[in-house]
């Protein structure tokens, strides 16, 4: 017996969630949807996976996550446009499914599945769930005609295409057991040749042909449909297996048993990350494997550095990385470094802020109060960044060996050392180096704006005609830790804390396009503009 999962479709109902990857790779909690499916089945069951839209992402992930599983991959040449359909996609796997098998949609999650449907069977069945939604196809069943074994199944009476009422019926959830596989494939071929079936819906096959005389219905007690935006949101809300991270649609972090698997949609990113990693691996968790779009390392039992953080440990962390050479100066062409620095701080930030202003139709053409601080209209973000680059600290910036997300949320403490988890592929066009001041700016950002507060909506933003009020909940250690960071950068590197604070503001401004339609977006913008203004005024006073 085999398990057949089709992942070839484009997932159009999921909009931007499938812009950069396959719908089976959408993350719910710690895992992508396809892992929730596979993990519900016995480890010795052979998998047949159809691949199409971003199929290479699915294959790379499964090879890393399940290296010991027997998996047959079936590439579907036409998964979008004329001639494509679920029927066509399934037919591509026919030669690999010449025995009884279970078919499972790649957007259907059922918990405790082995307790509800048979893994070994001698009849054909459809799996359904009681719901009032009219979005789904359904089938009627004879409640008085049921088996007496562990898995109660009922005589299936009739199928319906999206009926007006589901009273007394079960919604088809995209799981079925095919025992009479020869008859199944015969009917699939008939359906494919029938013009009425040139649609994406394989349920039409069951609806038209009724498939088998002994087709039975099995009812499950839970079901999550991740094939639409509302279903994904509900699944993420209910998921108990979760961790704090602000997700991006083109990147992902998965935890699969004893592995951490990171995903990067853009080709070339992983190659650059590996090149950078080879220079700074003493500070990182060792990479165990990687592919074109994924890298993998072992999950270790260590505290996230932000847990139980306190001023003593914070200062210890800063000194640990200083003493071990994380911020040692590197020899690099100064002209190249300065060009990359300008593009990173100026071009990138202005591009991000322009995206934000265009999206929200916001102009900087009048005075504004943020938290009752007057910011004159002359102090646009573009103007303030221009003034920032005239600072002696900007001009004297030294190239160092690390570039990444130097924040407590992306750092582990194993009792002996601190481990960095999130290094970046490059500092503009420089792969192996970065700007130490950016690291301090990111850490300063994290002390105020941490994942826990952001993910749990522990922030406020109130907009009035000429005044905006913003705040975010911070832990009680933050004020003292910021003072420690201030002393650290001023004492060890002779850098103004206001300069670091300005970089923090740049970080916030640059994050805004990542969270359009999320209240975090405006919070970051107004926090960033206020911090830019206050830091710039203080820097000017220092230099006068």
Model-derived features: positions:
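Conserved N-terminal catalytic core of the sugar/cofactor nucleotidyltransferase
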Residues: 2-5, 13, 27, 31-103
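Conserved alpha/beta core of the MobA/IspD/sugar-nucleotide pyrophosphorylase nucleotidyltransferase superfamily
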Residues: 3, 167-249, 255-256
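Conserved core of the sugar-phosphate nucleotidyltransferase
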Residues: 110-195
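Conserved kinase catalytic-core helix
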Residues: 150-151, 278-283, 303-402, 491-492
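Helix-rich C-terminal or lid/interface subdomains of diverse kinases
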Residues: 228, 316, 354-364, 441-442, ...
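ATP-binding glycine-rich loop module of kinase domains
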Residues: 245-274, 293-308
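Active-site acidic catalytic loop and adjacent metal/ATP-binding pocket
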Residues: 253, 387-436
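Active-site Asp-x-Gly
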Residues: 414-470
């Amino acid at each position: 017996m085999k398990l057949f999962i089709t992942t070839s479709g484009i997932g159009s109902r999921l909009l931007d969630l499938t812009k950069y990857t396959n719908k089976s790779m959408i993350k719910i909690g710690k895992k992508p949807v396809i892992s929730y499916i596979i993990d519900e089945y016995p480890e010795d069951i052979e998998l047949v996976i159809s691949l199409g839209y971003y199929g290479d992402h699915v294959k790379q992930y499964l090879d890393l996550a399940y290296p010991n599983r027997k998996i047959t991959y079936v590439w579907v040449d036409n998964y979008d446009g004329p001639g494509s359909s679920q029927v066509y996609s399934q037919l591509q796997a026919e030669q690999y499914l010449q025995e009884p098998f279970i078919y499972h949609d790649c957007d259907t999650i059922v918990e405790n599945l082995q307790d509800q449907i048979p893994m070994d069977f001698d009849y054909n069945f459809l799996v359904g769930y009681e719901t009032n939604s009219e979005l789904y196809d359904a089938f009627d069943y004879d409640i008085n005609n049921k088996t007496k074994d562990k898995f109660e199944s009922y005589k299936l009476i009739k199928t319906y295409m999206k009926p007006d009422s589901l009273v007394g019926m079960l919604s088809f959830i995209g799981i079925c057991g095919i025992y009479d596989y020869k008859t199944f494939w015969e009917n699939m071929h008939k359906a494919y040749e029938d013009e009425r079936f040139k649609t994406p819906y394989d349920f039409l096959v069951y609806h038209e042909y009724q498939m088998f005389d002994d087709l039975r219905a099995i009812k499950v007690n839970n079901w999550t449909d991740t094939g639409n935006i509302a279903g994904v949101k509900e699944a993420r809300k209910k998921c108990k297996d979760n961790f704090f991270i602000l997700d991006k649609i083109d990147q992902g972090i998965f935890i699969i048993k004893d592995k951490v698997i990171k995903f990067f949609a853009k080709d070339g990113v992983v190659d650059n990350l590996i090149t950078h990693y080879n220079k700074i691996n003493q500070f990182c968790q060792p990479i165990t494997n990687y592919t074109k779009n994924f890298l993998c390392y072992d999950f270790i039992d260590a505290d996230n550095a932000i847990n139980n953080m306190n001023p003593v440990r914070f200062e210890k962390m800063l000194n640990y990385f200083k003493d071990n050479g994380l911020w040692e100066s590197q020899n690099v062409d100064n002209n190249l470094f300065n060009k990359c620095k300008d593009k990173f701080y100026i071009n990138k930030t202005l591009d991000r802020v322009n995206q934000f202003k265009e999206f929200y139709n916001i102009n900087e053409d009048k005075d504004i109060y943020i938290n009752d601080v007057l910011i004159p209209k002359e102090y646009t973000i573009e103007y303030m960044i221009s003034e920032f680059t005239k600072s002696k600290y900007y001009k004297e910036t030294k190239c160092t060996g690390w570039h990444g997300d130097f924040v407590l949320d992306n750092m582990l403490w194993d009792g002996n050392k601190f481990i960095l988890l999130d290094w970046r592929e490059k500092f503009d066009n420089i792969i192996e180096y970065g700007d130490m001041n950016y690291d301090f700016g990111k850490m300063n950002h994290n002390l105020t704006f941490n994942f826990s507060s952001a993910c749990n909506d522990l922030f406020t933003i109130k907009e009035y005609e000429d005044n905006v009020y913003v705040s975010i909940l911070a832990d009680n250690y933050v004020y003292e830790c910021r003072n420690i960071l201030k002393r650290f950068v001023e004492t060890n590197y002779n850098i103004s804390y206001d300069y670091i604070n300005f970089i923090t503001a740049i970080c916030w401004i640059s994050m805004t396009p990542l969270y359009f339609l999320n209240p975090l977006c405006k919070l970051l913008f107004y926090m960033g503009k206020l911090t830019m203004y206050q830091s710039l005024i203080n820097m000017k006073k220092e230099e006068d």
